[in-house]
């Protein structure tokens, strides 16, 4: 923000763009400069426009699912029936610029697995980020069909409704949407178990395998059957077609 204000103070048309990561924790912000009617991404600390845009578009875990621009002039034309749920995505100082940023986007359309609270409502596209599902986009649900505009594929999401209680109510199972828009839902088959051998990083905090239980709506630990060496863990009781999460059980303090 300091670099942005310093450049704007001398007349350089710079803005801040931001994303919530979908393949790792937390969020990220960078700058974009206006030149001949187009914005070019760059990082004041790391790289210039060409190099930085290329990095965001080609490094798998850095490719944003949604990109937003922080505005200096509030856009009060945004109007939608509010459900009372609080999220920064509703700010009039935020603009969705995913499509204009050059990423391959798609319009996501998916049917809810659980009955929504009303025939039409706002819905939230969420990514799992730092031990919780966090909204990354707002869409609309009509007759149990959820729609979101300009989403980057090859990401895992879940869809939820919000409310004045500030809690999310999940109305789909977690799912993967690929770059073509094909959807695979992760609904565990507890009657069909699969095995998996996982690598243990030396010197790192021990991690545990979990799967998302669509009925309980949280990640359930999977028991480790054996540690085959000082570098591997062996699991034999993993529900088939489950969304797996391999991580420490608690947030860092």
Which residue ranges define each predicted feature?
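Beta-strand-rich domain onsets/edges
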Residues: 79-106
